[in-house]
Each structure stands twice: as structure tokens, then as C-alpha cells.
Amino acid sequence: MKTSHLIRITLPGALAAALLASQVSQAADLVPPPGYYAAVGERKGSAGSCPSVPPPYTGSLVFTSKYEGSDSARATLNAKAEKAFRSQIKDITDMERGATKLVTQYMRSGRDGDLVCALNWMSAWARAGALQSDDFNHTGKSMRKWALGSLSGAYMRLKFSSSRPLSAHAGQSREIEDWFARLGTQVVRDWSNLPLKKINNHSYWAAWSVMSTAVVTNRRDLFDWAVSEFKVAANQVDEQGFLPNELKRRQRALAYHNYALPPLAMIAAFAQVNGVDLRQENHGALQRLAERVMNGVDDEETFEEKTGEDQDMTDLKVDNKYAWLEPYCALYRCAPKMLEAKKDREPFNSFRLGGEVTRVFSREGGS
């Protein structure tokens, strides 16, 4: 009798198994790549004094564009406008850079003072409701998503470290994560439902900030949105590996193709460890884009032919602009030439990706 009962409930075996797998996948906690579980370094010396928290930015997010007055290519900087922009966003960038630096110092040295300082900085901004203004322009909502990616990416190292540094700071952790969740929800509103002609690297960076926030706050809805935005991006990559909306940047087209890669590679790496393989989206679009960029760095002629402009290589001479190579080469078996390019530029440290990218994707870090 028991046997027949078992047979009856297992008759639709394949369907039942598929449904069960789907339910388990949906129920599973979101996780980062393995390197984020790295233990805190052994304590070395004592922490210095905690710098003053940058004033929480609670004002309007209407900022001057550094390209103000430029034509539709948005490729020529306006020095006067850029100076105004840098002044307007100083507290935000000080917060991004400073908090990321404090987390990095703590993870390296294990000095409790650095941890306490980093958490005090973030909780101060959380309690103030910083960066939540509904009054914003394109530049302002761009700053919101960049800051969220920087701060949640750095905080993630504390959240998932096997040393459990946040265990004694439950109240502050809850404040900070609730703030990240509010910002993540706002970033989704800011960057949803754009026409394809308006979707470019900004949307990709927004998706990275939401992916990072999704993992920190275990929000499956945010994770799904980030994945959907990646798919839009992947389907913008043409057969030759170009992004048409970045080709519009003319002399900065190659630089902006490269700038599109860090958020996309990070999203793909985070999706992969959560059971979503994005590598084959649009017939391997991410790989086509990466190879097009690295070929362009070696010889920009193809970009010059596409845009009719000599390429501005200034940004491409900065090693950290290639931080995307770490998550990318964790996803793909990188060719020797690409591995050599990565090795020549390491270690990568990008505050917009949460700090020490090489460390969290290195074999020593656990990946």
C-alpha cells in the first residue's frame, strides 16, 4: 500500500522536480562570490582616529552636468561646469571614498576602530535619510546609484566575512541595510522603463548598485530587476561587440565601452553564484563586448572607423579602469593575452565596485 502511494505522488516526476527546484531557487538566500567570505586580517596595530563623517547629503539631487553645453555626443568636458559639479557632489564622493577606505583598512588589519568608524559613517547617513530626495535630475539620480553601489559593495565584505564582524553591531547593521533597501527601491524607480535609445552605461551602473543591494538585503525582487537590466544591456551589444549608444560618444566611444564593462561583469558574476548563468545572453554578448574593448585598447582603429574620430585614450591609461577583468576572468576562461593584461594592471581597487576587486575575486580570497 505504501508503495502504491509513493508511485501515485511521484507520477508527474519531471514536472514536480522542476517545480521543487524552482521553489528552492526562489527560497534560497542571495549570496556573493566566494571571495566575499574572506576572514578579516589579523589585527595589526591600533586604528587611527576616526575622521569626521561627511555631512549626510539630504538636499536636492539636482546637479550641474560636467558636460553642460556639450553637443548630443556628451563627449566634451566643460571645465567650468565640471568644477561646479565636483563642488556640489563633494560630500557624496567623500563618503563613497572614505567609507570604502575604512572597510578596506579593517579587512586588511582587523583594527576594530576602523570597523566602528565605517559603521558610524554609514549609520549616520542612514539615519539622516541621505540621498533619498525626490527632487533630482539625470546627474543627481546618477550620483544616487553610484553612491549606493560603492557603499553597499564595501559593506558586503563586512556582511559576509567568515569573521562575522557585524555580529556585535546588529542595530547599526539593520539601520544601514534598511537604508540601502530604500535607496535600491528608488534606483529601480529612477532607471526603469527608459526607451532603448536612453539606456546606456548609466543604466548598467544602476543595475550593479541594485544587484549589490539585493545581495546585502536578500531582496529577490531587486536581484531580478538587475538581471533583467543586464539582459537589456546584453541585447544592445551588436554582432561585432559594439554598443550603439556608446558609439555616440564619438572620441570617447572606446572609453565608454570599457566603462560599461565593470557593472556588467559584476552583475554576471553575482548572478552566476545565485544560479543564473548570463554568459550566453544574446549569443555571448558580454564576451563579444570584452574582446572588442581589449582589441580596441591594442588598436583603436576599429573605433575610429566606427565613429570617424580619433579616440581619447586618457582614461584607458588608468589601470583601475580595467577592474572588470577580475569578475570577467572568474566567469570565463580568459585567453593568455587577456590574463597578461589583467596581471600587468593588478591589483585592482575601485571604490565604485566596493574597494578591493582583486582581493574578492582572487583564488586566495576564496573564489
Swiss-Prot record:
Binding site for substrate: S65, K66, H138, T139, Y256
Natural source organism: Pseudomonas paraeruginosa (strain DSM 24068 / PA7) (Pseudomonas aeruginosa (strain PA7))
Any Pfam family: Alginate_lyase
Name of this chain's protein: Alginate lyase
Localization, UniProt: Periplasm
Function: Catalyzes the depolymerization of alginate by cleaving the beta-1,4 glycosidic bond between two adjacent sugar residues via a beta-elimination mechanism. May serve to degrade mislocalized alginate that is trapped in the periplasmic space.
Family per similarity comment: Belongs to the polysaccharide lyase 5 family.
Keyword Lyase: yes
Catalysed transformations (reactions): Eliminative cleavage of alginate to give oligosaccharides with 4-deoxy-alpha-L-erythro-hex-4-enuronosyl groups at their non-reducing ends and beta-D-mannuronate at their reducing end
EC class name: lyase
GO cellular component assignments: periplasmic space
Main location: periplasm
